[in-house]
């Protein structure tokens, strides 16, 4: 068995380096690799081999977690492209997007304050639909235009949207208790 711990996750799973991932192929490759590197297969071997299998298993799990979800996958692709997305330091966004975020937050807060579970659920659905549209834009930006600087801005937008999604989930949970 030979797994190169230095290869990127796409190469590890035998996938092309694209934002759109064949989820079935990823899943199949993951299970195949897990079968090859599972620590139980190395239990009878010397400690060095056991540690190596643990490293391999960890790398496979990390790769799978990264590639199976669109936002971590996009962040990883930016990293591979050498683009510093400034995910935690660069919060500069267009004024239109910032206005949209304020409107989302106000709507969430109003629904939360009024105890409107139905309205929060509607906001949840609208935000998920909007996020799908933005993910489609991200896919085109990465896979077709190969514009990683623009992709970094889209990733930051999606991170804002993810925060609002969590706020809606928290508000719904608070109403249920």
UniProtKB/Swiss-Prot annotation:
A Gene Ontology molecular function term of the record: ATPase activator activity
Annotated S-S bridges: none
Chaperone as UniProt keyword: yes
Pfam families the UniProt entry points to: HSCB_C
Superkingdom as given in the UniProt entry: Bacteria
BP terms from Gene Ontology: [2Fe-2S] cluster assembly; protein complex oligomerization; protein folding
InterPro entries: DnaJ_domain, HscB, HscB_C_sf, HscB_oligo_C, J_dom_sf
Entry annotated with the keyword Glycoprotein: no
Keywords of the record: Chaperone
Residues forming coiled coils: none
Domain called J: residue spans: 8-80
Protein family (similarity comment): Belongs to the HscB family.
Quaternary structure and partners: Interacts with HscA and stimulates its ATPase activity.
Functional summary from the UniProt entry: Co-chaperone involved in the maturation of iron-sulfur cluster-containing proteins. Seems to help targeting proteins to be folded toward HscA.
Protein name: Co-chaperone protein HscB homolog
Natural source organism: Aromatoleum aromaticum (strain DSM 19018 / LMG 30748 / EbN1) (Azoarcus sp. (strain EbN1))
């Amino acid at each position: 068995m030979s797994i190169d711990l230095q290869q990127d996750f796409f190469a590890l799973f035998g996938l092309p380096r694209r934002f759109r991932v064949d989820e079935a192929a990823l899943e199949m490759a993951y299970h195949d690799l897990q079968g090859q590197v599972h620590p139980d297969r190395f239990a009878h071997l010397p400690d060095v081999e056991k540690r190596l299998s643990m490293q391999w298993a960890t790398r496979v799990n990390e790769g799978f977690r990264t590639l199976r979800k669109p936002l971590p996958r996009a962040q990883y692709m930016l990293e591979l492209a050498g683009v510093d997305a400034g995910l935690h330091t660069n919060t500069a966004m267009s004024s239109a997007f910032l206005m949209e975020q304020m409107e989302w937050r106000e709507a969430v807060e109003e629904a939360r304050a009024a105890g409107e579970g139905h309205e929060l659920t509607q906001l949840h659905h609208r935000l998920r639909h909007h996020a799908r549209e933005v993910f489609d834009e991200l896919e085109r930006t990465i896979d077709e235009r190969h514009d990683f600087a623009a992709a970094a801005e889209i990733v930051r937008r999606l991170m804002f949207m993810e925060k609002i999604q969590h706020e809606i989930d928290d508000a719904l949970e608070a109403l249920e208790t």
